[in-house]
C-alpha cells in the first residue's frame, strides 16, 4: 500500500441485497471525475433523537430564501465565562448569583457573560477557523441562502468576519452553493451610519475587496443587502440596498426587516423585490412587553420553572402559585405551546414546539390557496448567540439580578448543536423545515444506484457518467485555538486525515462498487486501526436498527488486501462481519 494513492475503489460483497442507500444519486450530466460537484447533501436523510425525520430532495426553489442570524461576539471581549448549563442537575451557582440579596453580601459576577449551555464545539471564539468551517458546511448541508451577521451593538468584528469570508470563498471556489452574507447594524440611526461606513471600508470596497463580491447577498437585485441606515456618503449610499431593522417592541413598519416577532401568528413583512418576509425564531422573550400581563426576562421564567421552585423557597422568596405560573409562562420558551399558552421543559427538549409552530405559520400560508400570502423569505433567529450579560437588580428596579436574552436550554434561542440534551435536534428540524419550505421532491428513480459493473483493475474512466457525492476539501484541518473562556486551555484536535472529496457508487445486481477520492495521499493502514477510511451505510428498509440511521460499516477490520463489511451496534461499534471488500488503490 503506497502513500501516493489518492483514490480507493472497493468491491463490496454483502450477505443480503440492498434496495437503496440514504445517500446516492445519478446525474447523467456529469461525465468526468474532475467535473463532478454533485450536491449529495440533497440526497441525505436524517432522524433526530425524538424520531422526527426528513427525506431527500432533488433541488431547491431558487425564488425562495431562508437566512439565519449569526453572532460574532463569542470571545471578543467577555473575559471569564460563567456556565449556566444544567444548573438544576449539577449545581446552583448561577441561581444563587441571581437570587443573592445585597444584605447577603451582594450579587457576584455582575456584568459578566454567562453561557446558557455549551456548543458541541465548546466555548469557542468566533474567529476559530475550525468552528467556522464546520458552521459553513452545516449551512450548505441545510440549504441556507444567506447569513446575517449581528453587528447591532456597533462592533463589526473585523477579524471574525475576515476569517469567515476566506473560508466561505474557499468552499465557493470548490463549486459548492454557499450561503451569501449581509450585516445587520444598530436600530439607532447614528450608530448604524458609523457601522455601515466601517463595514463598507473593511469588507465591501471594490477597490480593495473585489474577491469577495460573489459572497454578498443580493436576492433579486444587483446591489448587496444591508440592514441599516444610509451614512450620507454618496458612494456608500448608492452601493447597498438598504433595509431598516424592525425591533419587536416598536411600531410596526411592514417595509422593514424583522429579526424576531413577538406576535403569533407572525406578521408578514413585504419587500418590493423579494416579496413576503416572515421571522421564524426558536423562542421569544415577549415578557419584556408583558405579553400576558406580567413583565419577565428569560431568567425570570427560568427561575420560576417547576424544577426551581423549591430553590426559590430555600432562598426565602415566597410567591403565590398564580404569580409563579404567570412568570414561568410570561415568555415563549422553546417548549411554549400557542394553544395551551404554557411552557414545558419536556416539550422544549423533545418536540421543539415553539420553533415548529413558528414554521407552521410559513407552511400554513403556503397552503391557504391564496398565492399572494405565500412566503418568499424566512429569517431564522438564531444560530449561535450562546451568552447573555448578567444585569444588576437595581437596573430593573427588581429584587433579583437577571439575564435578558438567554438563560438555559428551555429559555434560549440558538439552533446550533449543543453538548446538552438538545443535541442536534434543532439543527435537524431547521433542515427539515427548509426542505419543506423550498425543496423540490426527489423521485424514487433519481435515488437509485446506477447499474454498472466496474473492473477494479480497469481505468477510472469507467466511472464517467456516474455522479459523485462531493465532499468538502479542507474539512480535516487541525484545530488549535483559544476558548472564549480565558480560564480554559486551547481547543486542540489533530485527528483529521484522509480528506475525502468525492464518493461514487454503482452496482451490477450482485456487488456494490465504490470509488473514494481524497484530496491528498491516503495514509497507510496500520494494524488495529478501526477508524481508517470508514464508510457507513444506511439501508432504507432497516432504519430502525443500527447506529444513527446506519447499519453497516466498511474498513473496521482490514486483513491483507481484504477488508470487512460489518454490522453496527446501537453504540456505533462493529458487531459482526456480514461481508467483505476487495480494495484497490490508485
Regions found by a protein language model. Give the residues of each.
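C-terminal motif of bacterial Sec signal peptides marking the signal peptidase cleavage site
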Residues: 19-23
Amino acid at each position: 500500500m503506497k502513500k501516493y494513492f489518492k483514490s480507493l475503489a472497493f468491491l463490496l460483497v454483502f450477505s443480503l441485497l440492498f434496495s437503496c442507500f440514504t445517500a446516492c444519486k445519478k446525474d447523467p450530466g456529469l461525465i468526468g471525475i474532475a467535473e463532478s460537484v454533485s450536491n449529495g447533501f440533497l440526497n441525505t436523510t436524517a432522524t433526530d433523537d425524538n424520531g422526527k425525520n426528513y427525506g431527500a430532495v432533488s433541488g431547491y426553489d431558487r425564488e425562495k430564501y431562508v437566512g439565519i442570524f449569526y453572532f460574532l461576539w463569542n470571545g471578543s471581549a467577555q473575559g471569564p465565562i460563567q456556565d449556566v448549563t444544567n444548573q438544576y442537575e449539577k449545581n446552583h451557582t448561577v441561581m444563587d448569583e441571581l437570587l443573592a440579596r445585597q444584605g447577603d453580601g451582594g450579587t457576584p459576577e455582575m456584568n459578566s457573560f454567562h453561557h446558557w449551555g455549551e456548543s458541541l464545539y465548546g466555548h469557542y471564539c468566533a474567529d476559530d477557523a475550525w468552528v467556522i468551517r464546520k458552521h459553513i458546511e452545516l449551512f450548505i448541508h441545510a440549504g441556507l441562502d444567506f447569513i446575517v451577521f449581528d453587528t447591532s451593538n456597533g462592533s463589526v468584528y473585523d477579524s471574525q468576519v475576515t476569517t469567515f469570508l476566506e473560508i466561505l470563498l474557499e468552499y465557493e471556489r470548490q463549486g459548492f452553493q454557499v450561503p451569501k452574507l449581509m450585516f445587520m447594524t444598530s436600530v439607532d440611526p447614528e450608530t448604524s451610519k458609523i457601522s455601515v461606513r466601517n463595514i463598507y471600508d473593511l469588507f465591501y470596497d471594490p477597490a480593495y475587496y473585489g474577491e469577495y463580491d460573489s459572497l454578498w447577498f443580493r436576492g433579486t437585485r444587483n446591489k448587496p443587502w444591508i440592514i441599516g441606515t444610509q451614512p450620507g456618503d454618496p458612494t456608500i449610499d448608492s452601493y447597498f440596498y438598504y433595509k431598516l431593522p424592525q425591533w419587536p417592541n416598536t411600531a410596526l413598519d411592514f417595509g422593514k426587516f424583522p429579526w424576531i416577532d413577538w406576535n403569533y401568528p407572525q406578521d408578514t413583512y413585504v419587500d418590493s423585490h423579494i416579496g413576503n418576509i416572515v421571522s421564524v425564531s426558536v423562542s421569544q422573550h415577549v415578557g419584556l412587553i408583558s405579553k400576558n400581563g406580567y413583565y419577565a426576562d428569560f431568567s425570570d421564567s427560568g427561575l420560576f420553572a417547576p424544577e426551581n421552585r423549591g430553590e426559590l423557597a430555600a432562598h426565602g422568596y415566597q410567591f403565590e402559585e398564580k404569580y409563579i405560573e404567570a412568570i414561568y409562562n410570561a415568555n415563549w420558551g422553546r417548549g411554549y405551546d400557542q394553544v395551551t399558552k404554557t411552557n414545558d421543559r419536556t416539550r422544549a427538549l423533545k418536540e421543539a414546539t415553539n420553533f415548529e409552530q413558528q414554521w407552521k405559520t410559513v407552511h400554513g400560508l403556503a397552503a391557504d390557496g391564496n398565492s399572494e400570502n405565500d412566503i418568499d423569505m424566512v429569517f431564522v433567529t438564531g444560530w449561535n448567540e450562546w451568552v447573555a450579560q448578567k444585569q444588576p437588580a437595581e437596573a430593573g428596579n427588581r429584587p433579583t439580578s437577571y439575564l435578558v436574552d438567554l438563560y438555559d436550554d428551555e429559555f434560549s434561542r440558538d439552533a446550533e448543536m449543543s453538548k446538552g440534551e438538545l443535541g442536534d435536534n434543532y439543527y435537524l428540524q431547521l433542515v427539515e423545515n427548509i426542505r419543506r419550505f423550498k425543496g423540490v421532491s426527489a423521485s424514487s428513480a433519481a435515488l437509485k444506484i446506477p447499474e454498472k459493473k466496474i473492473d477494479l483493475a480497469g481505468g477510472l474512466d469507467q466511472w464517467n457518467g456516474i455522479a459523485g457525492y462531493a465532499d468538502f476539501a479542507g474539512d480535516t484541518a487541525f484545530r488549535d485555538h483559544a476558548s472564549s473562556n480565558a480560564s480554559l486551555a486551547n481547543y486542540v484536535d489533530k485527528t483529521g486525515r484522509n480528506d475525502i472529496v468525492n464518493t461514487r457508487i454503482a452496482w451490477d445486481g450482485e456487488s456494490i462498487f465504490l470509488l473514494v477520492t481524497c484530496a491528498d495521499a491516503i495514509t497507510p493502514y496500520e494494524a488495529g486501526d478501526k477508524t481508517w477510511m470508514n464508510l457507513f451505510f444506511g439501508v432504507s428498509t432497516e432504519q430502525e436498527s443500527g447506529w444513527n440511521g446506519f447499519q453497516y460499516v466498511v474498513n473496521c477490520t482490514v486483513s491483507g488486501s481484504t477488508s470487512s463489511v460489518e454490522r453496527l451496534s446501537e453504540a456505533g461499534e462493529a458487531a459482526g462481519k456480514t461481508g467483505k471488500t476487495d480494495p484497490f488503490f490508485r
